[in-house]
From Swiss-Prot:
UniProt entry keywords in alphabetical sequence: Ribonucleoprotein, Ribosomal protein, RNA-binding, rRNA-binding
Region (Disordered): 44-90
Cross-referenced SUPFAM superfamilies: Ribosomal protein L4 (SSF52166)
The organism's taxonomic lineage, starting at the top: Bacteria, Bacillati, Mycoplasmatota, Mycoplasmoidales, Mycoplasmoidaceae
One Gene Ontology biological process: translation
Protein's recorded name: Large ribosomal subunit protein uL4
Coiled coil spans: none
Biological function: One of the primary rRNA binding proteins, this protein initially binds near the 5'-end of the 23S rRNA. It is important during the early stages of 50S assembly. It makes multiple contacts with different domains of the 23S rRNA in the assembled 50S subunit and ribosome. Forms part of the polypeptide exit tunnel.
Family named by the database record: Belongs to the universal ribosomal protein uL4 family.
HAMAP family: Ribosomal_uL4_B
Gene3D superfamilies recorded: 3.40.1370.10
């Protein structure tokens, strides 16, 4: 079991939470993490790049010079690929799929590894259950960050569905990223300096890995 410090919504220490060790690994697997982040980055590529081939470049319909008796190499168009302003041979077209396959077990191993790194570095905190604000308030979330000594830190706040007011309250905080527990990726975890996870999210993660 791992012990996580839970904070109240005002940013002060509330209690300790024992989290199942199934969420962590003994030794973080760097290759699994690398593969997961690489696949996530690749999946965001839209593949809208498009170059023009010889037949698509404007102009070049007239033969530059006659075929014979000029002393120059024969050519049929000024848009041939070896000419300046010519088409591109085998250039990228917008039908390429950049998605990379990562097995589910590898993705889970990568996620556990990222959680383990944050835990070992002391960069993982919790948020007590039922901590959503009554109304959206950026000021209260600023107080939370200040009281928790998280100023000038890139904070990842992992919440559950019924924490909508906290989500709205952090929209204007530049260094705070708020995501639902099932939207968090390995890249999100590694990009953040500190990860604050809602108590309900720990329960959901534990239920997920136990399947």
């Amino acid at each position: 079991m791992a012990k996580i410090k839970l904070l109240s919504i005002d940013g002060n220490f509330a209690k300790e939470l024992e989290v199942t060790s199934d969420l962590f690994v003994e030794v973080p697997h760097k290759q699994a993490m690398f593969d997961s982040v690489l696949a996530e980055n690749a999946a965001e590529r839209q593949g809208t790049h498009s170059t023009l081939t010889k037949g698509e470049v404007r102009g070049g319909g007239k033969k530059p010079w006659r075929q014979k008796h000029t002393g120059k190499a024969r050519t049929g168009s000024t848009r041939n690929p070896h000419w300046t302003g010519g088409g591109v041979v085998f250039g990228p077209k917008p039908n390429r799929n950049y998605n990379l396959k990562v097995n589910a077990k590898v993705r889970l191993l990568a996620f556990k590894s990222a959680l383990t790194i944050k835990l070992n570095e002391g960069k993982m905190l919790g948020l007590v259950a039922n901590s959503d604000l009554e109304t959206p308030s950026t000021k209260k979330m600023v107080n939370f960050i200040n009281n928790a000594n998280l100023e000038n830190q890139k904070v990842l706040l992992v919440i559950v569905d019924n924490f909508s007011n906290i989500k709205k309250s952090t929209n204007n905080l530049q260094k705070v990223t708020t995501k639902l527990w099932y939207q968090v990726s390995v890249r999100d975890l590694m990009h953040a300096n500190v990860v604050v996870v809602a108590e309900e999210a720990f329960t959901n993660y534990a239920r997920k890995v136990s399947k």
